[in-house]
Amino acid sequence: WADTYNLFDNWIRLNELLALSSYFETYLSCIIGLSFESDPGLLIGSIHSVDGIKLLKDGHTFKKEDFKQRIIDCTRGDWNSRISYMKSTFGSVPQSLIDGRSELDKMRILRNKVGHAFGRDIEKSRNYALTQIHNMETLKTKQFLKYQKMIKKIASDIDQQLMNNHIGNFQPLYHYHLLYPSAVRKLNDGERMMLLKKSIGGDIKETYSKDFCRWVVTYYDQL
């Protein structure tokens, strides 16, 4: 019974690793895509040369194909190549990402074994002449917690870099852009500000001050 329980416990941790890795890659693809939409100059190596909100206001729509391959390059393959693509795109990457690339690659390889071969060596699992099933890879609790801590730190550092340097307040401005057809009919900036504040609170469950919402309205209207 104890052996079976330990195998099950290990299998749970391996699946937690699979989820952790998938969540991290989903986060990366989202925040990198958001950076391109907010700062389209990244696509041509000209940071801050174009305001993404200005493009939207002028009637231009983003085609995901414009930066789909860039996102793929930053989220697939081994971590040396991913980091290289991120450096070429954003100019630099957080030191925590560089320091963690070896562990990230170990995590990537193990994640692939879980996703494609039930936690076993992929190539050996495809050897159909085998007469026995290989044991699953082992992931100790201590190592899994180490991976969790590492991912949290790296995600936080990437978030800070891209939010500060490329994304800024793109999201609330984009939300106002979607509201604009109805907001433009309001008589004054105060009414538009309240419309934005209520919409953000109702749709996104975020709380922004009146002053910030007023700034969003003013910034957008002056573009």
Short names for language-model regions:
Residues 1-110:
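Helix-loop junctions and short alpha-helical segments
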Residues 19, 23, 106-113, 146, ...:
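Charged, amphipathic alpha-helical oligomerization/scaffolding segments
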Residues 28-36, 112-123, 156-163:
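Charged/polar positions within long, soluble alpha-helices
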Residues 33, 37-46, 114, 124, ...:
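Generic marker of "main functional regions" within proteins
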Residues 120-223:
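Polyanionic, low-complexity intrinsically disordered segments
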